[in-house]
Regions:
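Short, charged/polar connector segments at secondary-structure boundaries
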Residues: 1-67, 73-87
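Generic structural signal of hydrophobic/aromatic residues within well-ordered alpha-helices
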Residues: 75, 79, 119-122, 155, ...
Length: 183
């Protein structure tokens, strides 16, 4: 089954058709990444598009790697495997960055009970800087993308479809969601 809260869209577009044709000719060349979930079922961490293409191509089996991964390790692996894809939608980057940043903060450890708020902010800032370096974006741009997750779905779709400018959308994200409904 698919990874919970998977932020990347599997679209039946021209690129998918190209992938299906490639799979028909060559098979699936790169294994998908799976893990066992709490119900002892296989959960797809990475490879949702390859799996979909294989199904459309009529394949019944594909190569897979099964790893023992915590939730945070699975999130990091899923985002890392997908974030380098060309033409990611702003919404995909937004939720992927948000998920990975949260996982990185948890992996960095929670502050001790006697530490101040500044320590927690430092963990967040350092994690955002590390993420920015990993994906080739500025720390500020990571922050802007994550703000998009505060938009109502209708406005986020407008950003994805290039009908709402990115910077305007970031500004709108600070407005209460009930007010966003009126926009």
């Amino acid at each position: 089954h698919p990874f919970k809260n998977h932020p990347f869209k599997v679209l039946d577009d021209e690129k998918m058709q190209d992938l299906v044709e490639s799979v028909k000719i060559n098979g699936v060349l790169t294994p998908v990444l799976l893990r066992m979930d709490e119900n002892e079922e296989y959960e797809m961490v990475s490879g949702h598009r390859r799996m979909h293409a294989a199904q459309l191509a009529g394949l019944t089996t594909i190569p897979a790697i099964v790893r023992e991964l915590s939730d945070d390790d699975a999130i990091v692996a899923m985002v890392d495997a997908n974030i380098q894809r060309e033409e990611l939608l702003p919404s995909e980057k937004a939720f992927a960055y948000k998920m990975k940043l949260a996982a990185m903060k948890r992996q960095a450890g929670r502050p001790k009970s006697n530490s101040g708020q500044n320590d927690q902010n430092l963990i967040g800032t350092v994690s955002r800087d590390v993420l920015a370096e990993q994906v080739g974006e500025s720390s500020k741009q990571i922050q802007r993308y994550i703000r998009l997750t505060e938009l109502i779905p209708e406005l986020l779709d407008l950003v994805d479809n290039k009908k709402l400018q990115f910077t305007v959308a970031v500004d709108i994200s600070y407005i209460d969601k009930e007010v966003q409904e009126w926009i």
